[in-house]
């Protein structure tokens, strides 16, 4: 049998070996943290996405609103768009023909957000009335073409900044609000199922401006706030945030999950877009443009969207630009603001069609524009 001294010696050697492995692992992790997507991609020989001004063209201008356009959403499967405007109306458009199928006059004109239900048969909207209104598009219209509200979701103590249906669930909707919370609703009953934040210490400490539900795992969603953080939530555990993500230096106006659900992007008042890893919390990339020559300030990022592959990031800005970023190399491959028939005001919202073939942008110039990849251009 081994003596006590020999056992102690073996224990010391094993401990030293474990500590050495731990140190090597720590150093390796630190090396990975110091490597962003851009540098890694370049070391792997990735080439930039090449774009010509004719690769993405404005094929439709949707005119009909008499006020600033604040929000838009595509149907998951069909070519329909809903838009919300300062004129106090929701308009449902046929994206292929530019035809308006519904022009719904709202009881509260100060609308900030709108969303289609997964089946495309209902739309939701919210704003300064602190409520989320649901409209069934199959309802009988009155003489003026308006349809009645089918359900009003009340309970927020501040404006409703964003709303999104849970994918593949017609009866579940999540809203974000100026009361620093997000709420999961049962649309059928109008009741709150869960409240995220508020009295719980892990919640946001300022207005919540945006949210995005993970299409790969609809139990998870992220919220962006005026407290310059993003929080990850599990709808099954409302009492605490799963993780908090830092990095921005201004209000986070837009959050959007990456197509694979493992990452998400953000757009902020600090003028940057950022890409985060959901699991590790690591900031993978920063997409930052040069300041305007006139005032030396960065325009704010108002809205973002990813292409279906995730290789492109579309970002709308307060000065009317709409940049197309190469997400791997952090390079701008196109600015829609420089193209023919571009917007003449702030880009307030944007979204990609479900098949990735078209981008819709909304602006304070009262118009929406549909941008399509030209025939010879492969969708990325």
Curated annotation (Swiss-Prot):
TM spans (from-to): none
Alphabetic keyword roster: Cell membrane, Membrane, Repeat, Transducer, WD repeat
Amino-acid biosynthesis recorded as keyword: no
Subcellular location: Cell membrane
Pfam family for this entry, one: WD40_Gbeta
GO cellular component, one term: plasma membrane
Per-repeat ranges for WD: 64-94, 106-136, 155-186, 203-234, 247-277, 296-326, 342-372
InterPro entries, per database record: G-protein_beta_WD-40_rep, Gprotein_B, Guanine_nucleotide-bd_bsu, WD40/YVTN_repeat-like_dom_sf, WD40_repeat_CS, WD40_repeat_dom_sf, WD40_rpt
One GO term (biological process): G protein-coupled receptor signaling pathway
GO molecular function: signaling receptor complex adaptor activity
Functional summary from the UniProt entry: Guanine nucleotide-binding proteins (G proteins) are involved as modulators or transducers in various transmembrane signaling systems. The beta and gamma chains are required for the GTPase activity, for replacement of GDP by GTP, and for G protein-effector interaction.
Family, as annotated: Belongs to the WD repeat G protein beta family.
Subunit structure: G proteins are composed of 3 units, alpha, beta and gamma. Interacts with the gamma subunits RGG1 and RGG2.
Protein name: Guanine nucleotide-binding protein subunit beta
The species this protein was found in: Oryza sativa subsp. japonica
UniProt gene name: RGB1
């Amino acid at each position: 049998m081994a003596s006590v001294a020999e056992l102690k010696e073996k224990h010391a050697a094993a401990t030293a070996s474990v500590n050495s492995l731990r140190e090597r692992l720590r150093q390796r992790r630190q090396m990975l943290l110091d490597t962003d997507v851009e540098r890694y991609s370049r070391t792997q020989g990735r080439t930039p996405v090449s774009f010509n001004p004719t690769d993405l063209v404005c094929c439709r201008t949707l005119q009909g609103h008499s006020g600033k356009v604040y929000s838009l959403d595509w149907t998951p499967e069909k070519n329909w768009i809903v838009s919300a405007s300062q004129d106090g109306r929701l308009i449902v458009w046929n994206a292929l023909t530019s035809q308006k199928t519904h022009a719904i006059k709202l009881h509260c004109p100060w609308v900030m957000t709108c969303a289609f239900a997964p089946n495309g048969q209902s739309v939701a909207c919210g704003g300064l009335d602190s409520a989320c209104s649901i409209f069934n598009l199959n309802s009988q219209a009155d003489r003026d073409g308006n349809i009645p509200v089918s359900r009003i979701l009340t309970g927020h103590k501040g404006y409703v900044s964003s709303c999104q249906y849970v994918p593949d669930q017609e009866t579940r909707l999540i809203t974000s609000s100026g009361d620093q919370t997000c709420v999961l609703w049962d649309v059928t009953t109008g009741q709150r199922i869960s409240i995220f934040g508020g009295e719980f210490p892990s919640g946001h400490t300022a207005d919540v401006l945006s949210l995005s539900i993970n299409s790969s795992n609809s139990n998870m969603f992220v919220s962006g706030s005026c407290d310059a953080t993003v929080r990850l939530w599990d709808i099954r555990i409302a009492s605490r945030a799963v993780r908090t993500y830092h990095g921005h230096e201004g209000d986070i106006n837009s959050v959007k999950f990456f197509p694979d659900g493992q990452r998400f992007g953000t757009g902020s008042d600090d003028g940057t877009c950022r890409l985060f890893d959901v699991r590790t919390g690591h900031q993978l990339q920063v997409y930052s443009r040069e300041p305007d020559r006139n005032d030396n300030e960065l325009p704010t990022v108002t809205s973002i969207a990813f292409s279906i592959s995730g290789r492109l990031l579309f970002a709308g800005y307060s000065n009317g630009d709409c940049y197309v970023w190469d997400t791997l190399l952090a390079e701008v491959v196109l600015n829609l603001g420089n193209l023919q028939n571009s917007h003449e005001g702030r880009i307030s919202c944007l979204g990609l069609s479900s098949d990735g073939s078209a981008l819709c942008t909304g602006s304070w110039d009262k118009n929406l524009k549909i941008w399509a990849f030209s025939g010879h251009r492969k969708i990325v």
